Amino acid sequence: MTARNVLTSPTRAAECGAICAVAGQSQRGMREWAEAYPRLFAPKPFDAALYSTLSLAMAFSGPWFTAGQLRMANKATLWAFGLDWLVDYVATSPREAEDIARRCLEVAEGGSPLPGDDLTRMLADIRDELGASPAFPVLGPVWRAELRRMLEAMLRETRWKAAKAGPTFEEYLDNADNLGFSFVFFSHWLYVAGPDVADPATVAEAGRAVQRVIRLLNDLGTYERDVTWGDLNVLLLGVPRAEVERRLAGLAARSRELIAPLRAGSPELAGYLERQMDFCAGFYQVGDYWGGL
């Protein structure tokens, strides 16, 4: 199909319209969460475009899902952005970041959130919603493990930044859990799954492969912001852009290989993973989710 046909196809336009309508419903939910947990979402970085683009990312990645089915994908994503903001920009030392991680892990294990702590209060609400899923006996422990992996990766990055000693390219890729994609993906899967689920280890391998792809796509697309905000970025580690792009192509191909076996038994999971990767490939060529400092 030519570009002209794509742009003028009424079927494709109708599909995009339906997807955008779901995203609009989801965006309203995000704004309600931002109002419910006001200490977590500073107005400048969490601007209107952030809520809009995040909800569009989820809707286009799973166009077969309703806004209700995408509720947890959106809620966990927004929470992870709030966590990232606190760890990367609000915390003034690795010790403060470690305290944030400790509080989150305690709540994930069933503890009560601290009074006035919107981060753990929102996490407790996420935990309780997920606890009602029929898949929780199987995927609940995996969800907690994914949260721990994300927090540990975030803390590792804070230590790198504090020591002013950047990691190697391989160490950086191995730390891609700090992106939060796998945590959000498992939150979504747990929320929509029934009692019979695919093998978590197989799904996790595919999800982490996609996460590494999105990590590099993010870095290539947000280099200027990362320089301004003082973030780590693979291009700031002395890795040439051409080398990053070459590695990215290989990682994307490997991701598709790992996704392929999931299609027979879990077509929605497989499709969601691949579409997330492809959505980000287009999105980061043009924009970024964050607002301003």
List each model region and its residues.
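Alpha-helical, largely C-terminal catalytic domains
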Residues: M1-L293
